């Protein structure tokens, strides 16, 4: 069979089906849209499920795709086998009421024979037990009856993807790899056929004839229209066409393995291959998942990604790597896959950053965690026990970040077993209180507690910042207790409190509970119904139910929260005035440092709109508007025109916050008494959290002052560096220097005190002017320096003699190779002409790099052309190493490409080609 690269196979596939009238649909996200039964996209047909069931109008009747997929059901065997992967790509062609069984079979065989160039006598097929129709179609196309195998529901009835959706009988294509692949049992066994577990027959394409829709309950209902769903694993097909025994030996995965060899210093062999394969596979899953916005987390998809990162880190450790490592593969992965998935180019830097941070987080505790696990196993050995308890496993999880499955894998490698059920029980206990965070936990996980009327907390925080409070209930480690002691983390329920509990987007208050000899730091405040939960750490002394404490919030933090909450209301009003009444709040976060506001709007905000919104809010802030609070019946509140959240549940009586004609909203949060208290308002970021919605991040008050102080300090540092470079190069700042003054911190403080509502707009404009000037002058300085360097390069008489001394001597001529950074092609040609004039029998192989690009210039005299040297031919072969393009004549050729780091190696390769001709 003819060798074909993975990229070539994918291209052949999409071109073929496009010619057959299929719409080529881009791969969907790894997050399945509108399908709660799936954690990840696991097959090509997932994005087409609504089309098969008739749930949506058809945009086309036939489609094809190359779909990225993640499956982790066989995670523990990845790395141990030749073909298991968690990430793979699926080729698929689909019909929605258009063609059916006959055409699907014809397409599959035609593509296999005439495009993949698989010999017909090597193809076997399987069909569902009673599918005589499929058998006839295969035989009509020349597949003999003896190479058609009937299999049951387990093998030849497919679907659905998830718990529901389209499904039906299928027919699969197999490649006969020869009796030698059957091993000692099946080698020459005439009964060995597709369906056998040996490696002789490998399935490479599954044709599903969708006739049914399976409901969530498992019932099979006839589809409104029949359909075709085919799937062919891209890596599997490449393995067969490249005639290797493992998907990890195919061209793309082999490139990743080679990069791991370079980074680790280890060779890929029998002793290291499991580690190499795990890292190769998991890095792909993580790379594509992060690219689709699936970030490491404690639950759901994020937990799976975190588990893959940590599993790969453990296997990297077996190669002697004890530092963040996976993120270093991102560049290689980007180069490999950005042709099929161009969106990854722009995401690569973010992926690299997130991955590095996650690796650092895990490696920080890994060493200690492994030592702790070793202690546990040694203890079990002494006690002659074989089971690691769920409690121990959970301790490794909560303290050292070991995913349950990773601990299980580690202990089973050592011959122990793991108590899964016990781990689950410990996890349930921890749902409320965890070592890492108090935030967002639910009251029902506190043993022996219910939010009863007797535990109602009276909230005083709208008017008070401190109060005398009686302790109604205590919790430590999730359990109800009557007293606590120093050093314990606890949850305290009080009869009355000034602490605001998280709600309406505003985060909970922090502060202290004190009495003589006792101090409790409140790190967060949550609530369940009318019960307020003060969560934190006992810093000093003991506390018992019934004790009276002084409750006091952090007043400055509360003021900052009020600034940002009132600022959020003004922002909402400004958005509706400037963008239109279609703007609806979709969510918000109000913290002491910033606010985040999600709202409905179909497109990104322009620069002018952002300035308008910012100005509108700052005008309201400067207008000194009193903030009015009313408690109204809900009907009355709605009639007053107050805005409310559509999906929020309200009681019969609601609190309404008004700021003149600028804002009127339902709200239970804490606010300023006058808009002037907000100080200043600045938008720092605008983006999209999802289709049809926009997100603004903004800051208020002192945060705005600190923001601009930092912005201008950073800008001043950049300008200082630029001016220093200009002066060092040209002796003065006349042409390239930036002389406009950057406001000092003292001047900025004065501006904030004097300029009021206009200060943010003025500072934004000034910053932009300085940034534009810096960019323009930096570009001009760079070009001038480059021009000077090239002039010096051209005028250097010692360069020619130095290169001639370094030349490689061969029987029929000499060759000089050199890489010059930041030199233009014309200068290289001039240099080559000088060398040729001084030494007629010399071949010049020059390269230069600039940023992410590279250029090659090859030149010689005609005397070497007569001896077999053709610069154009040598260049063409060499540019493959740089993903480049170019060409030329026998005596002169020029080309460019990427991969500047590979230029030196490419010249070595060119030298080896020249050596053959000149020896």
Swiss-Prot record:
Q: Which GO terms describe its biological process?
A: alanyl-tRNA aminoacylation
Question: Which SMART domains does this UniProt record tie to the protein?
Answer: tRNA_SAD (SM00863)
Identify which cofactors the protein needs according to its UniProt entry.
Zn(2+)
Q: What molecular function terms (GO) are annotated for this protein?
A: alanine-tRNA ligase activity; aminoacyl-tRNA deacylase activity; ATP binding; tRNA binding; zinc ion binding
Question: Sorted alphabetically, which keywords does the UniProt record give?
Answer: Aminoacyl-tRNA synthetase, ATP-binding, Cytoplasm, Ligase, Metal-binding, Nucleotide-binding, Protein biosynthesis, RNA-binding, tRNA-binding, Zinc
What does the note accompanying the cofactor annotation read?
Answer: Binds 1 zinc ion per subunit.
**SUPFAM superfamilies in UniProt:** Class II aaRS and biotin synthetases, Putative anticodon-binding domain of alanyl-tRNA synthetase (AlaRS), ThrRS/AlaRS common domain, Translation proteins
User: What does the entry list under GO cellular component?
Assistant: cytosol
Q: Would the keyword ATP-binding turn up in this protein's UniProt record?
A: yes
Please write the reaction equations for the catalytic activity of this protein.
Answer: tRNA(Ala) + L-alanine + ATP = L-alanyl-tRNA(Ala) + AMP + diphosphate
Q: Where in the cell is it found?
A: Cytoplasm
Residues bound to Zn(2+): 565, 569, 667, 671
EC number(s) recorded for this UniProt protein: 6.1.1.7
Domain of life here?
A: Bacteria
Q: What does the sequence similarity comment in the record state about its family? A: Belongs to the class-II aminoacyl-tRNA synthetase family.
Query: Record's domain comment?
Result: Consists of three domains; the N-terminal catalytic domain, the editing domain and the C-terminal C-Ala domain. The editing domain removes incorrectly charged amino acids, while the C-Ala domain, along with tRNA(Ala), serves as a bridge to cooperatively bring together the editing and aminoacylation centers thus stimulating deacylation of misacylated tRNAs.
Q: What does this protein do?
A: Catalyzes the attachment of alanine to tRNA(Ala) in a two-step reaction: alanine is first activated by ATP to form Ala-AMP and then transferred to the acceptor end of tRNA(Ala). Also edits incorrectly charged Ser-tRNA(Ala) and Gly-tRNA(Ala) via its editing domain.
Please report the name of this protein according to its UniProt entry.
Answer: Alanine--tRNA ligase
Species in which this protein is naturally found: Leptospira biflexa serovar Patoc (strain Patoc 1 / ATCC 23582 / Paris)
**What gene, per UniProt, encodes this protein?**
alaS
């Amino acid at each position: 069979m003819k060798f074909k690269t993975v990229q070539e196979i994918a291209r052949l596939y999409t071109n073929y089906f496009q010619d057959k009238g299929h719409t080529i649909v881009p791969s969907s996200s790894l997050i399945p849209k509108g399908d709660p039964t799936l954690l990840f996209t696991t097959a090509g047909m997932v994005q087409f499920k609504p089309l098969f069931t008739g749930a949506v109008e058809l945009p086309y009747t036939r489609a094809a795709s190359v779909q990225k997929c993640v499956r982790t059901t066989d995670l523990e065997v990845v790395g141990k086998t030749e073909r298991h992967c968690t990430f793979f790509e699926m080729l698929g062609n689909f019909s929605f009421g258009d063609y059916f069984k006959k055409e699907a079979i014809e397409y599959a065989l035609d593509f296999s024979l005439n495009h993949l160039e698989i010999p017909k006598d090597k193809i076997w097929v399987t069909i569902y037990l009673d599918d005589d129709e499929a058998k006839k179609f295969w035989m009509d196309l020349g597949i003999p009856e003896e190479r058609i195998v009937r299999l049951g529901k387990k093998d030849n009835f497919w679907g659905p993807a998830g718990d529901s959706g389209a499904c039906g009988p299928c027919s699969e294509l197999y490649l006969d790899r020869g009796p030698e692949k059957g091993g000692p049992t099946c080698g020459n066994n005439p009964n060995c056929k597709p369906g056998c577990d040996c490696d002789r027959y490998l399935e490479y394409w599954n044709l599903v004839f969708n006739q049914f829709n399976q409901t969530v309950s498992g019932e099979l209902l006839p589809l409104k229209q029949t359909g075709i769903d085919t799937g062919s694993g891209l890596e599997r097909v490449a393995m067969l066409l490249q005639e290797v025994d493992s998907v990890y030996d195919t061209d793309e995965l082999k490139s990743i393995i080679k990069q791991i060899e370079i980074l680790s210093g280890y060779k890929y062999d029998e002793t290291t291959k499991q580690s190499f394969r795990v890292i190769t596979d998991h890095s792909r899953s993580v790379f594509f998942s992060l690219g689709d916005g699936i970030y490491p987390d404690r639950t759901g998809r994020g937990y799976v990604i975190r588990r893959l990162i940590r599993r790969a880190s453990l296997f990297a450790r077996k190669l002697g790597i004890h530092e963040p490592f996976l993120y270093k593969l991102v560049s290689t992965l980007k180069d490999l896959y950005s042709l099929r998935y161009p969106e990854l180019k722009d995401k690569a830097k973010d992926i690299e950053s997130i991955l590095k941070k996650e690796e650092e987080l895990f490696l920080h505790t890994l060493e200690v965690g492994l030592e702790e696990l070793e202690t546990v196993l040694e203890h079990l050995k002494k006690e002659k026990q074989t089971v690691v308890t769920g409690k121990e496993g959970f301790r490794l999880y909560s303290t050292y970040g070991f995913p349950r499955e990773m601990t299980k894998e580690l202990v089973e490698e050592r011959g122990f077993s793991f108590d899964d059920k016990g781990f689950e029980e410990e996890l349930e206990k921890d749902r409320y209180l965890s070592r890492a965070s108090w935030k967002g936990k639910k009251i029902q996980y506190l043993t022996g507690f219910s939010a009863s009327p007797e535990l109602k907390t009276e909230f005083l925080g709208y008017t008070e910042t401190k109060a005398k409070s009686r302790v109604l209930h205590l919790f430590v480690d999730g359990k109800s207790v009557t007293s606590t002691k120093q050093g314990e983390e606890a949850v305290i329920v009080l009869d009355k409190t000034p602490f605001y509990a998280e709600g309406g987007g505003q985060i909970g208050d922090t502060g202290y509970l004190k009495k003589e000899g006792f101090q409790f730091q409140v790190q967060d405040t949550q609530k369940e119904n009318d019960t307020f939960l003060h969560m934190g750490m006992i810093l000093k002394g003991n506390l018992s139910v019934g004790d009276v404490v002084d409750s006091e919030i952090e007043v400055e933090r509360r003021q900052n929260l009020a600034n940002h909450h009132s600022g959020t209301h003004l922002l909402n009003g400004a958005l509706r005035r400037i963008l239109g009444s279609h703007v609806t709040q979709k969510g918000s976060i109000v913290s002491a440092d910033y606010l985040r506001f999600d709202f409905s709007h179909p497109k990104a905000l322009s620069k002018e709109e952002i300035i308008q919104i910012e100005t509108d809010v700052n005008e309201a802030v400067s207008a000194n508007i009193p903030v009015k609070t009313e408690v109204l019946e809900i009907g009355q509140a709605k009639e007053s025109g107050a805005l409310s959240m559509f999906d929020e549940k309200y009681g019969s009586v609601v609190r309404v916050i008004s700021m003149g004609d600028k804002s009127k909203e339902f709200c239970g949060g804490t606010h300023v008494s006058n808009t002037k208290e907000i100080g200043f308002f600045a938008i720092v970021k605008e983006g999209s959290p999802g289709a049809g919605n926009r997100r603004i991040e903004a800051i208020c008050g002192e945060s705005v002052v600190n923001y601009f102080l930092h912005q201008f300090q950073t800008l001043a540092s950049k300008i200082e560096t630029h001016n220093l470079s200009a002066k060092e190069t040209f002796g003065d700042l006349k042409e390239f220097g930036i002389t406009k003054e950057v406001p000092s911190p003292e001047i900025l403080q004065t501006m904030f005190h004097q300029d009021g509502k206009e200060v943010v707009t003025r500072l934004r404009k000034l910053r932009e002017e300085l940034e534009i000037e810096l960019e323009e002058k930096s570009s001009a300085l760079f070009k001038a320096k480059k021009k000077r360097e090239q002039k010096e390069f051209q005028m250097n008489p010692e360069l020619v003699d130095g290169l001639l001394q370094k030349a490689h001597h061969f029987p029929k001529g000499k060759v000089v190779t050199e890489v010059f950074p930041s030199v233009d092609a014309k200068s290289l040609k001039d240099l080559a002409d000088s060398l040729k004039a001084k030494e007629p029998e010399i071949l010049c192989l020059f390269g230069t790099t600039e940023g992410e690009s590279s250029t090659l210039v090859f030149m010689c005299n005609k005397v070497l052309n007569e001896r077999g040297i053709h610069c154009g031919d040598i260049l063409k072969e060499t540019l493959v190493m740089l993903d480049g393009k170019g060409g030329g004549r026998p005596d002169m050729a020029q080309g460019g490409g990427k991969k500047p780091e590979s230029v030196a190696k490419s010249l070595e390769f060119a030298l080896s080609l020249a050596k053959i001709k000149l020896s």
